[in-house]
Structures are given as C-alpha cells and as structure tokens.
Amino acid sequence: MDGVKANQRQQLQLLLVAARHQLSRSDLRSMIQFLENEDCGFNVTLQMADPSEQPELLELHRLVATPALIKLSPTPKQVFAGSSIFQQLQNWITRWQQDIVVTGLGLSLRPTELDGSRTQRELQLEDQLLVLRQENETLIDRLNAQERTLRMVAHELRTPLTAAVLALQSQQLGQINIEHFQDVVKRRLDEIELLSKDLLEVKSTKWEDLFNPQNLDLGNIAAEAILELEKLWLDRNIEIRTDIPSDLPKVFADQRRMRQVLLNLLENALKFTEDGGEVSLTMLHRTSHWVQVSICDNGPGIPEDEQERIFLDRVRLPQTSVSTSGFGVGLSVCRRIVEVHGGKIWVVSEPDKGACFYLTVPVWQRNGQE
C-alpha cells in the first residue's frame, strides 16, 4: 500500500527558533535541506524566527535555550532542543507517519493498537522521559555556553593588561612620551571596563550574544594588532611581513573579537619564532563570500597528531623549548570566535618548518547585512 496520497497529506507546521549565526550549524542546515527536499509524508511548512527579533517566542513556547524546533501542527505541540534536534525530528517523523497510515485506514489512534505489547501508560512515560532528556540537554548546553563565555572573557582580559604593561616598559625606557603612555593606558582601561560588563552578563546572556558584527576593515585591525605587539618583535629583531591587498573587501565581523583572534595568533607566532626570525601575515579574497587570513612563523612547528588537539578546550601542549610555554587555551577561544562568525580555522605545519594558521571571515554583503 502506498499510504496516504499527496493531496490527502496532513499539514506539518514547524517553527525553528534560531539566531542567524546558529543557522550555519551543519546539523541545522541538513535538517532544513531534509524538510525542503525529502518526501516525509507531510506537507511541510517551516517557519524560522530570530529570538533577538522576536524575544516573545521564548516565553510563549517556554524555551530555555536556542536553537529549538517546535511542532505547531498537528497537535499536540512538541519542542525539540539540544545538540541533536535533527536526529530527534527524524525519530519522531517515523511515529507521525504511523499515525497518518492508521488514520487513513480509519482505525483508532490509541497507542495500544499501534503496538499491542506496550500500554498507553508506557508510551506516555516514554514521551515524558524524552522531554526530560531534551530539557537536560538544553541545561547542559547553557552551562557549557556560560563556561565558554567565562573562558573567553578571562582570556581576553590578558590583552589590554599586556598592552598596558608593554606601554609602561616603553615609557620607562624613554621610547614613548608620557602623553602616548597615558593614551594607551586609558584605551586599555576602557577595554577592561567593557569586558567586566560582559562578565556581569554571563548568567543572563548566551555566549554568542556578546558578538556585535559590523562592516569592518580587517586590514586596519591587523595593523593595530601588529603595532600593539611592536615591543615584542622589535626587541627581538623579528621581521613582520604583511601582504594585504588594497582592494580587500570589508568583512562582517565583531571588531573586538577579531582583534582578539589576530592578537592571539600573532603573539603565538612571535613566541615560537627565534630572535632574528620572520612572521608573515597575509590576507586574500579567495571567493565572493570569504576573506582568508594566514599568519605564519618559522618556529619549531606543530606535530601532526597535535594539530587538531590544540583547538580543543583545556588543551595545552607541552613547551617546545626553554623559552616558550606551549600553546594555551587561547586557540580554543579563537576557534569558537571564528566559528560564531561562520568561518573556519586550521593549521598547516611540519616539524622544524614553522606553522601557518589560517582562518576565514565572511565578506560584508551590502544587501543582506545592513
């Protein structure tokens, strides 16, 4: 039997509540493609809403976190959340299809008639258990998000403090005047104040909501980062080579976070480069949608079996020499920042031939991001 004909299909109305950056998740993209292209036995209507634009949806549907998929029709309403939304939907579609077949045959929809070996009470308990699992996944996701936010902000605090210390050392050596020193310290204190506000918002704000993407000149951000670390490379006679095209398009990114990524990668490159060595920073407009950044050094390199691990949380590689302390948690923060922007970050390295870190940043699109 072919089941219910297309013109007799029941409407399946779904609402996906997700922020723009969350829609770049591979599982959500796969789910949307599945609902648009696959024959799942329903006439599917999928609506999408951004919680930042429609915050009332969170209260209306009692959503603890996003992304969340809500089945509005047919009733009863169901909410899918956590890291396995697509898998949950696929599992439930099978049960909904069974309901359609039974209805088409004019039979009762009592669960006991779908599966004689299981009582209606057992199925109700199974549904309740599924809801509890979903809520547990959502709470775990929220706790993990808060932990990531704390780690990111704590790591970011190092940047203005380091810059202030370097400015103090330069002023004491007579390399900058008192006015320049005061200007640097004031700007760094302003940064620390902003970071302290982020810390206060951790409990009420998702990590991703601390990002404020805008039309940004990434070349200028890189130049500022190089200048900020000037003392680190000048004192060690390290040459920094840059290749940034004059026609490089603007990117759509958060200024503070992109600056943090470039500072961290440059600082690592300088740390692993011997005195008199070379560090390069290159930007390329590879496609109409992405700018690719590469930061390379001629240090000791990174073992192949460690090249994935260095981007994981809480991973710190052993020191490679007496003068270096190894890669710290900064790279995991960099990875999360880049991924929130929809980009990717990776490393290419061989022992004793240095390392090149690559990342992609989305190009600012005039029509879609104004």
Curated annotation (Swiss-Prot):
GO molecular function: ATP binding; phosphorelay sensor kinase activity
Reaction equations catalysed: ATP + protein L-histidine = ADP + protein N-phospho-L-histidine
Residues where Phosphohistidine is found: H155
Biological process according to GO: circadian rhythm
Cited Pfam families: HATPase_c (PF02518), KaiB (PF07689)
Enzyme Commission (EC) number: 2.7.13.3
Keywords per UniProt: ATP-binding, Biological rhythms, Kinase, Nucleotide-binding, Phosphoprotein, Transferase, Two-component regulatory system
PROSITE patterns: HIS_KIN
InterPro entries: HATPase_C_sf, His_kinase_dom, HisK_dim/P_dom, HisK_dim/P_sf, KaiB_domain, Kinase_SasA, Sensor_HK_Regulatory, Sig_transdc_His_kin-like_C
Residue intervals of the Histidine kinase domain: 152-365
Subunit structure: Homooligomerizes. Interacts with KaiC. Participates in the KaiBC complex, whose core is composed of a KaiC homohexamer and 6 KaiB.
Record remark on domains: The N-terminus interacts with KaiC, while the C-terminal histidine kinase domain autophosphorylates and is probably responsible for self-oligomerization. The N-terminal domain stimulates the C-terminus to autophosphorylate.
Function: Member of the two-component regulatory system SasA/RpaA involved in genome-wide circadian gene expression. One of several clock output pathways. Participates in the Kai clock protein complex, the main circadian regulator in cyanobacteria, via its interaction with KaiC. KaiC enhances the autophosphorylation activity of SasA, which then transfers its phosphate group to RpaA to activate it. In addition to its output function, recruits fold-shifted KaiB (KaiB(fs)) to KaiC to cooperatively form the KaiB(6):KaiC(6) complex (independent of SasA kinase activity).
Protein name in the entry: Adaptive-response sensory kinase SasA
Gene of this entry: sasA
